[in-house]
């Protein structure tokens, strides 16, 4: 009897925490969110030069087997980036409507085409510009950089 009561209380607690959003079930977007963070978020730096791109692309494991042709690093706090997910939905390049846009500080890294993995070489361009990100989940989190 006491064991059944304990199970009931634990179930009630879990449902309450789920309702409050304190415990989140994983639907696969957690892995996509972590990948987005690894590939695109670097709030501590402003970037802007070729050396930065060469180092960060290697550190973030985007040069292991081939040189990723293009990547953007966002130099904003993750909460600022996540707030983009609360803006009006727009259409993504793939036709879905889970994209959102905002203006952020970025460094765009473009492969020079004259090197081979893992020693890839990049050209950097720092700017403040409009970006488009795809968001999923509840609460919504960025899972894909769309442009």
From Swiss-Prot:
**GO biological process per UniProt:** antibacterial humoral response; defense response to Gram-positive bacterium
Q: Which cysteines are joined by disulfide bonds?
A: 53-109, 67-120, 85-135, 92-99
Q: Which keywords does this Swiss-Prot/TrEMBL entry list?
A: Antibiotic, Antimicrobial, Disulfide bond, Endonuclease, Hydrolase, Nuclease, Pyrrolidone carboxylic acid, Secreted, Signal
The record's subcellular location field reads: Secreted
Q: Which SUPFAM superfamilies match?
A: RNase A-like
Catalytic activity, EC: 3.1.27.-
A Pfam family that the UniProt record links to this protein: RnaseA
> Which segments cross the bilayer?
none
Which residues participate directly in catalysis? 40 (proton acceptor), 144 (proton donor)
Q: Can you tell which superkingdom this protein's organism belongs to?
A: Eukaryota
Q: What protein name is recorded for this chain?
A: Ribonuclease 4
Which organism encodes this protein?
Pongo abelii (Sumatran orangutan)
């Amino acid at each position: 009897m006491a064991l059944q009561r304990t199970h009931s209380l634990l179930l009630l607690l879990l449902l309450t925490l789920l309702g409050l959003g304190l415990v989140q079930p994983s639907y696969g977007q957690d892995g996509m969110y972590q990948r987005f963070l690894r590939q695109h978020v670097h709030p501590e730096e402003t970037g802007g030069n070729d050396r930065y791109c060469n180092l960060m692309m290697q550190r973030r494991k985007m040069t292991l087997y081939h040189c990723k042709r293009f990547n953007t690093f966002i130099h904003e706090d993750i909460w600022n980036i996540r707030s983009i997910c609360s803006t009006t939905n727009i259409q993504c390049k793939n036709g879905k409507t889970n994209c959102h846009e905002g203006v952020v500080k970025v460094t765009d890294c473009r492969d020079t085409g004259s090197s081979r993995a893992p020693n890839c070489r990049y050209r950097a361009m720092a700017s403040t510009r409009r970006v488009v990100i795809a968001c999923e989940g509840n609460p919504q989190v960025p899972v894909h950089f769309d442009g």
